[in-house]
């Protein structure tokens, strides 16, 4: 059976540091470093991933590339005194993962749009880049689309800030079931934050 074009794209992205994609990514990242933190782009970098996440090349659907710093929290050293245990500056991490941060920043930049999903497109020593798929819930092309019209409902407003995207659900521990996931449902807060 003949392979689809998407399967070749998917195979190339399994090891983006090797082969032809490595040179292409090297050139891309030089351009990305000179761009802003949130940039609207014409078309997805990873078409296979974007399509699997719900992207369609139609009106009302846009893609934005977001860069977020890598590593742990950026915490300033305290000026006032405190005991050693409370003086921590390094090795303090946020409970929210970088992909979620990227989605939220894109949503704040485009407040009239709703985040559908996102995926990674690369990283260097300082930052990670994600592409975020955003949907216009007021566009007739979206309201009449059988696959995307659900995002127009009122209960999907601010969905990214409530952890309802794929990255948000993973970050809340909702990707697993059974043993080890007892404290993640119905929510982390209802279990005293013991789920993570």
Curated annotation (Swiss-Prot):
Gene name in the database record: rpl15e
Lineage of the species this protein comes from: Archaea, Methanobacteriati, Methanobacteriota, Stenosarchaea group, Halobacteria
Keywords of this entry: Ribonucleoprotein, Ribosomal protein, RNA-binding, rRNA-binding
A molecular-function term among this protein's GO annotations: rRNA binding
NCBIfam families on file: PRK04243.1
Protein name: Large ribosomal subunit protein eL15
Gene3D superfamilies: Ribosomal protein l15e (3.40.1120.10)
Region (Disordered): 72-93, 163-196
Ranges in coiled-coil conformation: none
Organism: Haloarcula marismortui (strain ATCC 43049 / DSM 3752 / JCM 8966 / VKM B-1809) (Halobacterium marismortui)
Organism superkingdom: Archaea
One GO CC term, this protein: cytosolic large ribosomal subunit
């Amino acid at each position: 059976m003949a392979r689809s074009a998407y399967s070749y794209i998917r195979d190339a992205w399994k090891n983006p540091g090797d082969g032809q994609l490595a040179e292409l990514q090297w050139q891309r990242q030089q351009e990305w470093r000179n761009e802003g933190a949130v940039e609207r782009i014409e078309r997805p970098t990873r078409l296979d991933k974007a399509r699997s996440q719900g992207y369609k090349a139609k009106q009302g659907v846009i893609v934005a590339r977001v860069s977020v710093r890598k590593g742990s929290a950026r915490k300033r050293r305290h000026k006032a005194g405190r005991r050693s245990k409370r003086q921590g500056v390094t090795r303090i991490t946020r409970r929210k993962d970088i992909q979620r941060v990227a989605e939220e920043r894109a949503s704040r930049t485009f407040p009239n749009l709703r985040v559908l999903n996102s995926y990674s497109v690369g990283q260097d020593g300082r930052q990670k880049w994600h592409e975020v798929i955003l949907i216009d819930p007021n566009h007739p092309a979206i309201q009449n689309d059988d696959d995307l019209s659900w995002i127009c409902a009122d209960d999907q407003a601010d969905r990214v800030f409530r952890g309802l995207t794929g990255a948000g659900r993973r970050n809340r521990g909702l990707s697993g079931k059974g043993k080890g996931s007892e404290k993640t449902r119905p929510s982390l807060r209802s279990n005293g934050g013991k789920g993570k």
